[in-house]
Amino acid sequence: MAIADINSILSRSFRNDRISKISWEKGNYLNVTMCVTEECNLECTYCYMVGKNNFKKMTFETAKKIIDFIVNDPYCNNLSDNLLIDFIGGEPLLEMELIDKISDYICLLLYSKRHKWFNNLQFSFSTNGTLYDSKIMEDYLKKHRYHAGFGFSIDGTKEKHDLTRITRDGKGSYDKVIKSFYKYKQDYEDEIFQKSTFSSEDLVYLKDSIIHLWDLGFKNVESNLVYEDVWKEEDPSIFENQLKELADYMFESGRYLTHSVAYFEKRRGLPLASNSLNQNRCGAGYKSLAFDTDGNIYPCIRFLEMCSDDKKGMIVGSIDKGVDYNALRALCGTTWTSVSDEECNNCNVGTDCGWCVAQNYQENGSLYNRVKHICEMHKANVRANKYFWKRYELETGKTSDRVIEKVLFSKHNELKYVYFITSDDAPSFCNYTKRYNEGNYMSKDLYDNALEFCLDN
């Protein structure tokens, strides 16, 4: 079909205001990841895709079979009224012509079937940003303007970014990515999503990198640590200090009012709610499916063979045979409790502590044997998180969102009320007569100690 025809179809009913944004925000969508190539033009030092290569690429015929399978399979259709297609690699923009064909094909197919996903479809790109500035990319965004979102991998300052996100010949990629970022920002006013990643070798750049990302215009910075076994004995202390220095900067500059970073999320490090203990953290296999270049089906992208040192992938079906529900069944029981040891199950700062069933499977040979490389780093994050919210209370005189969240997110989920008698110097009113000329006031130290007691009991 000609470009004019696809544009005409998309313009008839496909607009962002027709999509149930509330439903998307609550995570109510089927996430289908399509690995269009295992090739990448970068060699990032911390990348978990250890088996990238330049010969495994998806064909359009395979892509069409994947789309046909998703659209016609009852299991996929019943999972959600919303569909997210995530194009990934390698570097997906290396196969932009293929992605363009795939996007047109699924839109036309959904339209012809009057499918519920036609007005509830989003395309997502997980890209390193170096190949964005191209004619085909420009044409694609004009055509699929209303349902395509980009996530740029920008790690922070040029020094930090160029240390870890390098080209095949060892050069930094910061300048190329920033050029792409500014072009996208100039062309479109949409919010741009970013992701930054930190490992042992670059922790010392964390504070300056988060500030740099804020300066670029990212008000809510998404940043995380790698899950792999890379951490050294001194890293938790470095991480904690970097975050505390960042917290100090936020209050001294006033940016705590306008900007945020994931490390200071209000729930991070709270005791686990009872309902969290029996939930799957990521939804692999029942909220997400991933397809490799040959059309094999996996619970998520991290189960692909190229993501494992020993090529131990976990295939749960194919486009020819469909989903193997017996293979998926093993994932149904992967909850916090079932994959964790006694230490994790009794942890009092467990909320937001990352775990990955694919990593369990690849490193320990079982979905139910939790990898814990991140443990001490998470605890360091929690200490810094408490520091941030404590300073928030000192600066504002208000009860922090973290304290409120702890009550709401507690295991018992019931509100408790505590009264602080901060002074006995009450004025006379009605039938009450003032009994003291000089009042007794609760000291700040006593107030802080009492509040800590309440939080811990």
Regions found by a protein language model. Name each.
Residues 207-277:
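Long, K/E/R/D-enriched contiguous segments that form extended
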Residues 39-49, 299-302, 341-359, 377, ...:
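Local cysteine-cluster metal-coordination motifs and their immediate loop/turn environment
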